[in-house]
UniProtKB/Swiss-Prot annotation:
Annotated protein name in UniProt: Asparagine--tRNA ligase
Catalytic activity, reaction form: tRNA(Asn) + L-asparagine + ATP = L-asparaginyl-tRNA(Asn) + AMP + diphosphate + H(+)
Subcellular location per the Swiss-Prot or TrEMBL entry: Cytoplasm
Organism: Myxococcus xanthus (strain DK1622)
Gene Ontology molecular function terms on file: asparagine-tRNA ligase activity; ATP binding; nucleic acid binding
UniProt-listed InterPro entries: Aa-tRNA-synt_II (IPR004364), aa-tRNA-synth_II (IPR006195), aa-tRNA-synth_II/BPL/LPL (IPR045864), Asn-tRNA-ligase (IPR004522), Asp/Asn-tRNA-synth_IIb (IPR002312), NA-bd_OB-fold (IPR012340), NA-bd_OB_tRNA (IPR004365)
GO terms for cellular component: cytoplasm
CDD domains: AsxRS_core (cd00776), EcAsnRS_like_N (cd04318)
EC number in record: 6.1.1.22
Keyword ATP-binding: yes
Length: 466
């Protein structure tokens, strides 16, 4: 008896006639007048369930098999044979169907064998992975994560685990979750009535990280090429389809690199991940194409086969101003591009991915390298058709005197960045990197409309369930 996954059984990874054991959960059960039950069983390993053919000669047929409903857990043992019906290559002719767990009340079980709204499924996030949509999202997410690690490994990068608890604000925006063990009702105070953070767990104010970039820079300036891939937190009160309070970030950092090399890396990276998902998740993408958003497969294929257009920010603003299109937000130099602007550039002006480069210094972060014009920084955004910005990156400011000016201009506390300044004091070199919200990538590949559906348990303003 060979224990096999549904994926392996359906793909012909086991010789026909082999005695197999398949473990999983019931999707549907159909009974014939001939005294045979056809039970579709899924174990999450692939999109399609496998059909288990259970005859009424099985000893538990009347008592258990005829009472199987969606969600019941079973172990099926029998012979793997070519399927007589349409829709799948193989099925299991059962000698035994062991029922491990019934559903308490099938009528109130949240995941019924029907189509549910995504809004409803967010309220049962602990069960929604049992649906076609979310099991497919999970497989795509897994395959994409594997592709991320494989890409950077093949490119000679080292994976660095940066801290989740930090005293530095990498973005300088102040939208951070505080980490504290002090009594929230009656915290210790200094003589002037302020909270005495010296008595907190870390002896100072601490926060959940908004980015691993600053720490990654330190490692890049010794290891040459590193990347982070981990959870990130933003206390941004944005209740939109594009924002999460907790998400996963991919952040490579490369020593001796400039902005153009950074853009080249971003292009190679995205194409690698898309190729991996297209190659390995075909059944899942077919489902997204048919049931979620038409065109997702073609969009990814075009993305892979396109060269990225590079446009200077100043040029992009001029293009938008001349466009014969009414925008909700008028394009103006010195303001960030809105999603409508980004999509116009990629979908109507160019027709492929765009890298916008050299943004006004006032609208970008303190660590970005100031260009010679004194007005712009060596920053870039990679824009993708259908979604807009998908990657943000920059060449980092490697000159200590300029970095100090930027820290002061942004009103940051210099004492919090002494270690970061050290990187410019001890063998500083030009370096660059970018950041990519992993969930935004999943949204793009799956054709989802809401980023809350791209992560198992979404954390958003007003909600931290499960």
């Amino acid at each position: 008896m060979q224990v096999v996954s549904v994926k392996k059984a359906l793909a012909g990874g086991v010789e026909e006639g082999t005695k197999v054991e398949v473990r999983g959960w019931v999707r549907t059960r159909r009974d014939s007048k001939a005294g045979i039950s056809f039970v579709n069983v899924s174990d999450g390993s692939t999109f399609d369930p496998i059909q288990v053919v259970a005859p009424n000669s099985l000893p538990n047929y009347e008592k258990e098999i005829l009472h199987l409903t969606a969600g019941c857990s079973v172990i099926s043992r029998g012979t793997l044979v070519k399927s007589q019906g349409k829709g799948q290559a193989y099925e299991v002719q059962a000698d035994e169907v062991q029922v491990l767990g019934f559903v308490d009340d099938p009528d109130t079980y949240p995941i019924q064998p029907k189509q549910h709204t995504l809004e409803f499924l967010r309220d049962v996030a602990h069960l929604r992975v049992r649906t076609n949509t979310f099991s497919a999202v999970t497989r795509v997410r897994h395959r994409a994560a594997q592709a991320v690690h494989r890409f950077f490994d093949e490119e000679g990068f080292f994976w660095v685990n940066t801290p989740i608890i930090t005293a530095s604000d990498a973005e300088g925006a102040g939208q951070m979750f505080r980490v504290s063990t002090l009594d929230a009702v009656n915290p210790p105070r200094t003589s002037d009535g302020k909270i005495d953070w010296h008595k907190d767990f870390f002896g100072k104010e601490a926060y959940l990280t908004v980015s691993g970039q600053l720490n990654a820079e330190a490692y890049a300036l010794a290891m040459s090429k590193v990347y982070t891939f981990g959870p990130t937190f933003r206390a941004e009160n944005s209740n939109t389809t594009r924002h999460l309070a907790e998400f996963w970030m991919i952040e490579p950092e490369v020593a001796f690199a400039d902005l153009n090399e950074d853009a080249n890396l971003a292009e190679r990276f995205l194409k690698h991940v898309f190729k991996a998902v297209l190659n390995d998740c075909a059944p899942d993408l077919k489902f997204f194409e048919e049931r979620v958003q038409k065109g997702v497969i073609e969009r990814m294929e075009k993305f892979i086969n396109s060269s990225f257009e590079r446009i200077d920010y100043t040029e992009a603003v001029e293009i938008l101003k001349k466009a014969k299109k009414k925008f909700e937000f008028e394009p103006e130099w010195g303001k960030d591009l809105q999603t409508e602007h980004e999509r116009y550039l990629t979908e109507e002006h160019v027709g492929r991915p765009v890298v916008v480069m050299n943004y006004p210094e006032a609208i970008k972060s303190f660590y970005m390298r100031l260009n010679d014009d004194g007005k712009t920084v060596a920053a870039m955004d990679v824009l993708a058709p259908g979604i807009g910005e998908i990657i943000g990156g920059s060449q980092r400011e490697e000159r200590l005197d300029v970095l100090d000016q930027r820290i002061q201009k942004f009103g940051l506390k210099p004492e919090s960045y002494q270690w970061y300044r050290d990187l410019r004091r001890y063998g500083s070199v030009p370096h660059a990197g970018f950041g990519l919200g992993f969930e935004r990538l999943i949204v793009y590949m799956c054709g989802l409309q809401n980023i809350r559906d791209a992560i198992p348990y979404p954390r958003v303003p007003g909600s931290a369930a499960f």
